[in-house]
Amino acid sequence: MKHHPFFSSVLSGGKCISYGARALNEGGFQSIPKVSFPGGALIGDTAGFLNVPKIKGTHTSMKSGMLAAEATYAALTENTSGTVMLYAYEDALRASTIWKELKQVRNMRPSFHNPLGLIGGVLYSGLEAYILKGRVPWTLKHPGPDHAATLPVSHPSVRKITYPKPDGILSFDLLTSVSRTGTNHEEDQPVHLRVKDWRAHARREFPRFDGLENRFCPAGVYEYVEEEGEGKGDGLGVRFQINAQNCIHCKTCDIKAPSQDIEWSTPQGGEGPKYYMT
């Protein structure tokens, strides 16, 4: 996209100073979980408070943090012993502007899952945004999890995309981009990207998806390394490898892995990308 004449004319002469990635929680209103649990609460992006059409969630994150803080203070002052449950946070959330805002746009993202596809979604979303404004008696559902939408390489509609080599001006190679995140993890700590069975994962995923992890990861964490010789690579000719120190915590793997056997967990030392205001 950056090489499109319009965008390249804007970006030319500039300097890339940072890089980052984060998977968007597009579930919206329909996917808000129970936000309180014994001794804690879910706030912000953890609870999925992103306004998907606007791709904005800072304001809802801040508001949910304020609501949780108020509920926490009330719970701690009223209950001096036992487990603290933030029931007041659940109630305050439903009476807040967060709930009202997300409910108003709840049908926009699911509307793209229709027989008319993109065109149908655009038409319905426009109707919702400018006329209906969420004041409808129905709530559209998401058809299924994101990972279930991944097609195998054998599917007729799947074609290989060949991208041009990065020019070092507008586009950059992956390792250069990762270096701009400032990410760092201690090499000797347990891998925080947990795979139930590495060999089984490779046997199951590589023949069907031809190294999907290589393509959806924006930091080069996952690799299928070529291995030749009898008995190597389980007959696939490749070995599944995780470069966890490169991880920038976008959580795409946890969401998109077709077999759902990759689990992102907090690194032992709490490390990760060092983002800063640019």
Predicted regions, residues:
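Flavin-binding catalytic cores
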Residues: 1-21, 41
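Active-site-proximal substrate-binding core of FAD-dependent oxidoreductases
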Residues: 16, 48-54, 66-118, 231-236, ...
